[in-house]
Amino acid sequence: MVGPLSDRAIRRILKPLVFAASLSPVAFLIWDALTHQFNVNPFNAIVRSTGFWSLRFLCLTLAITPLRWLTGWHSVMKFRRMIGQFGFFYGTVHTAAYVLFDRLAGLDASVRARPLVATAHTLSAIGADLLRPFFAIGLVAFALMAPLAATSSVGMMRRLGGRRWQVLHRLVYPVAVASILHTYWPLTPRAPRYAVIIGMLFVLRLGRAYARRRASMARRVQATG
């Protein structure tokens, strides 16, 4: 069992440390760009790296509740929103990098000089990409992440009501599945490990839900007995 931490220690020490650690991938990307550590296609490296970091933070977000169950460390829940927001942040950077580097930067200079024409060409290219399942699934994952990030605050939880908020935030599981498929589709070697991690976390969730259901049924039997 992990002992409780004071709110002051979490707010002043641990949260800034977690925030800084969560931003470290950006610092490493900037460093690699400045020191020319990227391969022949640096833009592709940025797109891939931010995509994987979004998936990693998604895995961490899903792991927080099981970690609380297994360790009794309830204070860890205070970090879930921040980690989830970083998952959306890296997903946003991943999507923006794809649009800017893979699509907009690939246009002829004369086309880029005309904003409306460049926008039309870029949207046309994105529309063509969406006919490919790999891109379409990635867009679905990002679109589902947006309402989760927008409603992750305590204030939004109160506005929606606890039950509706919980139902909405179960979208994290379709997001996880879509993210794995988006990663796995191009046969990326690292994708299976994330599938295993998310699968194990999902099994833990199911086991916890089953145990709670049995406990609830047992209490009902005792109450009626």
State what each model feature region is:
Residues M1-G225:
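Membrane-embedded alpha-helical bundles that constitute the cytochrome b-like, heme-associated redox core
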